[in-house]
């Protein structure tokens, strides 16, 4: 993003759309208009596009090899033409893109099979006639994997194009943002060429290079800033490798006296629930840093291990420092380090986190025209003018990569101690900004105390029933097969259900359903909205295809994948939460993502049934009731909605009465859609698509909504005015989210920013409230004698706990009280927060 925007190139992002699909759609559209297209990539999937149509060519450029890729190069690589590349990929799979393929089938075998049989289906069909072999068994047994893989590698060529090709024409590159980008990343020769051609931008405001002997930091953006501290340039030769217990104890004594130490850990892997601790680094000031190796060497039984402190002795020496309330421990992404240290028996407090500081100051903000991520390397470059050593530089890549524990100690010290040194410098840079830029409240009262809470939740994990998951996978596979047969029976012909092209032809050509629209690729659109419309009009086949697609996705994403995610040591699934993953402040969940399991469907319930409590325990799910609508009523000051909530009315039924004059299943459903859609700044076209009506009718509904609830429209107008004026939105708890594209000349970017800005104060306030509840929860439970209750998950507006069955009543009372009162005393809401609580031996049963 940073580079493209610096060069004034369009940066196109579409929610829920793969980048490859956007590239494919633009490439095909340009080709249709007669342009020669070069895709700058070496991605195997995109090689399916290479070739010529109607005199217009698509080729590729591999910049790593400085090589063009034409049809001949594709055939040389895959043994087949571009049109069969997807078939080859479906057999061989791709671990990088999570394409399963068929285990044991490599590129050569896959190419040979496709070349010999002419396509994937034919190759799989031919397996039955093969001589007995492992290959035959694999092709038959894993046919479904190959067929699913073929869907996954198929490029969509009919995506909407938010920026027209005409608007992509580049006339002139404004020099200021480009100069800032080049200066930030050290492209000095390019910067000189730019200045020679366009004149020099204001160096004082745009580049602000560091003095030769110091490493200052350009970090200008909207708003006033305190002068940033200047530090000596990073000198890796000054770092110490601590190899004796005496020297370690001297460092610990100095840290105790300093009352503040930056800490970083080095591990054997990125999985903090399974990794070994390889070393610890400490920093007490700029260039005053050390690395304590604890687990280097040992993989080669014939090689002598390097001298290092005995691990048990080192851990015993470090424990008082890490536990001391008198010494602040500063981390970057401290949640990871806290889990690593907890795995080795450490209790760590108090904790500061520079990644969280950066997020609370600059979420969404672009600095010097450049994007604002929160990783250490990016922050070091942005704020310190320093380029950190990378893990790849130290450990290598590919087949030559070595584990960190095998890195020579001199190199390991440079890398590890630098991390602690940079963390210390970032702390001294960012901490003062919290006070001067209004970030202290959200950092100190919400996000900083949340770090150890979330770390503990990750360590708890949640038990899953592997047998139940395997059974669900088997049931889903059977249902998928059954649905496929029923779909074929309705169609009167066999076809590949997962193929949008074949499905479109069956629906609109063979069966003759009306309303089929071909995209620019010449294929009928068969996306979810099309199928939902057809199903609503009585097309049985469309409903079955929707069900087939959902089952296939859930099987691949959850019932199969969750079995692989079970920790072999604990038998539980340990998801990883990101505290900086969503600009509004919401937590995001990965590895596995537990937040995308369908909420209100029978299938989603079945998957949740596989998340279970230990014997004698139950799971308790506590969910805020319609919290965003309650917050909207408060923040927009809507008397009608306030009254409805105060009286305990069904809010969607009340909206239906206000909008349509009556309540029935249809009007309530429409009212519910409208309630949430308008809070997200939906357009009339977007609402029309969701409700299946014409745009004019949708606009009339929006107008009626604003007439019945005028406070909502005033809130939207007021919020957008404030964001345009200040550059950021703000929650009730003073969390800022920046919107640098709110005044973009690009309509798609501007409208996307406006929609996000409308919702950010509401969604962000909701996130702040549940975070405040999480921070307060365990102290409240401990005070009630319920410290053994474990908080396991946070999913959207829900918290999930595990506890003995006999403690349900007492724990429910505490949990409801904490969650309902989480906004206070900082914010007094006009509408009480409702909390729904359920329990059961499984997560599904708790709903």
What are these regions, as identified by a protein language model?
Residues 1-162, 377, 381:
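Extended two-metal-dependent nuclease catalytic cores across DNA- and RNA-processing enzymes
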Residues 13-15, 38-42, 262, 326-334, ...:
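Acidic beta-strand-to-loop metal/phosphate-binding motif
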Residues 46-80, 136-138, 290-312, 316-320, ...:
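Short alpha-helix plus adjacent loop in nuclease-associated cores
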Residues 47-52, 270-271, 280, 335-346, ...:
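Short active-site loop/helix that positions an aromatic residue
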Residues 142-304, 349, 367-371, 379, ...:
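Conserved "right-hand" nucleotidyltransferase catalytic core of DNA-directed polymerases
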Residues 402-405, 456-459, 567-582, 587, ...:
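Conserved catalytic core of nucleic-acid polymerases
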């Amino acid at each position: 993003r940073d580079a493209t925007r610096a060069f004034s190139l369009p940066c196109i992002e579409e929610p829920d759309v793969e980048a490859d699909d956007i590239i494919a759609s633009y490439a095909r559209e340009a080709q249709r208009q007669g342009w020669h297209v070069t895709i700058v990539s070496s991605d195997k999937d995109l090689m399916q596009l290479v070739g010529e149509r109607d005199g217009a060519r698509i080729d590729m450029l591999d910049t790593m090899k400085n090589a063009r890729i034409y049809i001949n190069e594709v055939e040389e690589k895959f043994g087949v033409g571009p049109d069969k590349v997807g078939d080859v990929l479906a057999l061989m799979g791709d671990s990088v893109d999570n394409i399963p393929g068929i285990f044991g089938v490599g590129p050569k075998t896959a190419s040979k099979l496709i070349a010999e049989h002419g396509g994937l289906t034919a190759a799989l069909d031919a397996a039955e006639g093969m001589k007995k072999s492992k290959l035959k068994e694999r092709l038959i047994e894993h046919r479904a994997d190959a067929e699913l893989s073929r869907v996954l590698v198929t490029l969509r060529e009919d995506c909407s194009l938010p920026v027209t090709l005409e608007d992509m024409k580049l006339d002139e590159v404004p020099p200021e943002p480009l100069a800032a980008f080049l200066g930030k990343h050290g492209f000095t020769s390019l910067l000189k060429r730019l200045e020679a051609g366009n004149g020099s931008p204001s160096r004082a405001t745009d580049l602000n290079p560091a003095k030769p002997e110091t490493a200052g930091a350009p970090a200008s953006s909207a708003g006033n800033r305190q002068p940033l501290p200047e530090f000596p340039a990073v000198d890796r030769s000054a770092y110490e490798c601590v190899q004796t217990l005496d020297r370690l104890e001297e460092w610990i004594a100095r840290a105790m006296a300093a009352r503040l130490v930056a800490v970083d850990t080095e591990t054997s892997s990125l999985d903090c629930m399974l990794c070994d601790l390889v070393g610890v680094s400490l920093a007490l000031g700029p260039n005053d840093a050390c690395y304590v190796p604890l687990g280097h060497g040992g993989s080669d039984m014939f090689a002598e291990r390097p001298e290092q402190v005995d691990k048990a002795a080192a851990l015993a020496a470090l424990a008082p420092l890490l536990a001391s309330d008198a010494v602040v421990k500063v981390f970057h992404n401290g949640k990871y380090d806290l889990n690593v240290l907890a795995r080795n028996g450490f209790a760590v407090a108090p904790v500061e986190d520079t990644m969280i500081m950066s997020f609370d100051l600059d979420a969404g903000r672009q600095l010097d025209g450049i994007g604002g991520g929160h990783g250490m390397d990016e922050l070091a470059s942005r704020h310190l003018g320093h380029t950190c050593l990378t893990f790849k530089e130290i450990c290598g890549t590919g087949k030559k990569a070595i584990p960190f524990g095998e890195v020579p100690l001199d190199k390991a010290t440079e890398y590890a101690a630098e991390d602690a040194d940079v963390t210390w410098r970032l702390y001294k840079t960012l901490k003062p900004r919290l006070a001067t830029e209004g970030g202290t409240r959200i950092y100190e009262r919400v996000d900083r105390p949340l770090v150890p809470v979330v770390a503990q939740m990750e360590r708890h994990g949640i038990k899953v029933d592997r047998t139940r998951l395997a059974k669900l996978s088997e049931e889903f596979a059977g249902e998928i097969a059954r649905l496929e047969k029923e779909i074929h029976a309705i169609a009167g012909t066999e076809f590949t259900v997962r193929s949008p092209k074949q499905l479109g032809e069956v629906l609109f050509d063979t069966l003759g359903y009306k309303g089929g629209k071909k995209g620019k690729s010449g294929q009928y659109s068969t996306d979810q909205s099309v199928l939902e419309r057809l199903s609503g009009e009585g097309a049985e086949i469309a409903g079955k295809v929707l069900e087939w697609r959902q089952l296939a996705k859930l099987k691949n994403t959850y019932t199969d994948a969750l079995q692989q995610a079970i920790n072999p040591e604990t038998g539980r699934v340990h998801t990883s939460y990101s505290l900086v993953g969503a600009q509004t402040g919401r937590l995001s969940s990965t590895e596995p993502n537990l937040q995308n399991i369908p909420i209100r469907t029978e299938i989603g319930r079945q998957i949740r049934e596989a998340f279970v409590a230990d014997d004698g325990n139950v799971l308790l799910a506590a969910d805020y009731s319609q919290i965003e609508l309650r917050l909207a009523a408060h923040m927009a000051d809507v008397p009608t909605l306030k009254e409805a909530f105060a009286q305990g009315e069904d809010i969607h039924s009340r909206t239906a009465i206000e909008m349509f004059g009556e309540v029935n299943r249809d009007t309530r459903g429409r009212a519910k859609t409208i309630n949430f859609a308008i809070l997200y700044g939906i357009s009339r076209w977007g609402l029309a698509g969701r409700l299946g009506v014409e745009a004019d009718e949708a606009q009339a509904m929006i107008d009626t909504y604003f007439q019945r609830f005028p406070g909502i429209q005033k809130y939207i107008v007021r919020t957008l005015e404030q964001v345009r004026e200040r550059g950021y939105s703000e929650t009730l708890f003073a969390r800022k989210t920046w919107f640098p594209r709110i005044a973009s000349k690009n309509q798609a970017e501007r409208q996307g920013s406006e929609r996000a800005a409308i919702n950010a104060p509401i969604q962000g306030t909701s996130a702040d409230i549940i975070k405040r509840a999480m921070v307060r929860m365990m102290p409240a439970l401990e005070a009630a004698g319920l410290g053994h209750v474990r908080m396991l998950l946070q999913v959207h507006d829900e918290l999930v706990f595990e506890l003995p069955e006999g403690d349900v009543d007492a724990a429910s009372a505490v949990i409801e009280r904490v969650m309902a009162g989480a906004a206070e005393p900082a914010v007094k809401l006009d509408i009480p927060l409702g909390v729904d609580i359920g329990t059961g031996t499984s997560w599904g049963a708790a709903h």
